[in-house]
């Protein structure tokens, strides 16, 4: 089944050659209740992030309708305002709706205290809304850090050295989200901060959080509770994304386990990304949501 997006959004041209997508006009003629997914895009380059996430959602056998949400208390300068006006809504516009699933992206603000982020108060309102009106929510990188702080009070810790590269993770707990994954799960990371691992382990002991994937050196990378998925890495990254960040940062720190001996990029996490997103849509969204929202 297709991903339903506007024909004039940039991702449409990117995906139409290799994914099953459908424009809004055609979708209206089908008598199928699609899965309603809200994407809270906190990244500065919103179009790039749209392309990454929509390409993963387009691999699902389910029909998925997308709503894009951006903060209104802070509007960045890296995305054309015309694009935001055409394709994005604010929290007030979506408050009357319920959603089957939501995805909250990362943001390049992890070195700041949460309270100093320009849109922090608005983000707390968004989290309040997701808690009450969404069947299952997925939080990515800084979005996951912010959500762990919001839901469980877990502290963010600044790192002396950036976690940057593609890391192998062990499966810690059995879960449907891990169905059909490799024994060692590869995931890109790009962050200057982490979450307090002792607090996370204590929450797991209390039965509040479940650690699904973990790396011995960098700690927990995929966690969940009954309704929320927390991903501290970037499964959505395209092949070149870490390299582009390496160039942007003036070649300061080379991404680990990312280049082969000849300097070519090893794009070896994509199947894991497709599987986790498909499992989330199937088990946590589709099979858990009521037919009438």
From Swiss-Prot:
Its UniProt pathway annotation is: Amino-acid biosynthesis; L-methionine biosynthesis via de novo pathway; O-acetyl-L-homoserine from L-homoserine: step 1/1
Name the catalysed reactions: L-homoserine + acetyl-CoA = O-acetyl-L-homoserine + CoA
The Gene Ontology biological process terms listed for this entry are: L-methionine biosynthetic process from homoserine via O-succinyl-L-homoserine and cystathionine
Report the active site residues.
141, 234, 236
Mind telling me which SUPFAM superfamilies this protein's record contains? Class I glutamine amidotransferase-like
Point out the annotated site residues (description: Important for substrate specificity): 190
What does this chain do? Transfers an acetyl group from acetyl-CoA to L-homoserine, forming acetyl-L-homoserine.
Report the sequence similarity comment from the record.
Belongs to the MetA family.
Q: What is this protein called?
A: Homoserine O-acetyltransferase
Per the UniProt record, the source organism is Campylobacter jejuni subsp. jejuni serotype O:2 (strain ATCC 700819 / NCTC 11168)
The protein's gene is named metAA
């Amino acid at each position: 089944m297709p991903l339903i997006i506007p024909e004039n959004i940039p991702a449409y041209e990117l995906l139409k050659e290799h994914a099953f997508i459908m424009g809004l006009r055609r979708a209206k003629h089908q008598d199928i209740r699609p899965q309603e997914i809200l994407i809270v895009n906190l990244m500065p380059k919103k179009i790039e992030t749209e392309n990454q996430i929509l390409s993963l959602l387009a691999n699902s056998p389910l029909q998925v309708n997308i709503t894009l949400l951006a903060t209104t208390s802070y509007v960045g300068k890296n995305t054309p305002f015309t694009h935001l006006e055409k394709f994005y809504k604010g929290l007030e516009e979506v408050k009357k709706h319920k959603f089957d699933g939501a995805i909250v992206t990362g943001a390049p603000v992890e070195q700041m205290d949460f309270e100093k982020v320009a849109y922090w108060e608005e983000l707390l309102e968004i989290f309040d809304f997701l808690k009450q009106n969404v069947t299952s929510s997925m939080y990515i990188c800084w979005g996951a850090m912010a959500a762990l702080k919001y839901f469980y009070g877990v502290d963010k810790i600044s790192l002396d050295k950036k976690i940057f590269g593609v890391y192998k993770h062990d499966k810690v707990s059995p879960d449907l989200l891990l169905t059909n994954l490799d024994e060692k799960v590869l995931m890109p990371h790009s962050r200057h901060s982490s979450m307090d691992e002792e607090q996370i382990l204590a929450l797991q002991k209390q039965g509040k959080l479940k650690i699904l994937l973990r790396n011995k050196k960098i700690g927990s990378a995929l966690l969940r509770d009954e309704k929320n998925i927390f991903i501290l890495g970037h499964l959505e990254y395209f092949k070149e994304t870490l390299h582009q960040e390496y160039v942007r940062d003036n070649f300061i720190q080379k991404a680990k386990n990312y280049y082969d001996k000849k300097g070519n990029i090893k794009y070896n996490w994509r199947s894991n990304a497709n599987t986790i997103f498909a499992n989330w849509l199937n088990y946590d969204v589709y099979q858990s949501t009521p037919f009438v929202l």
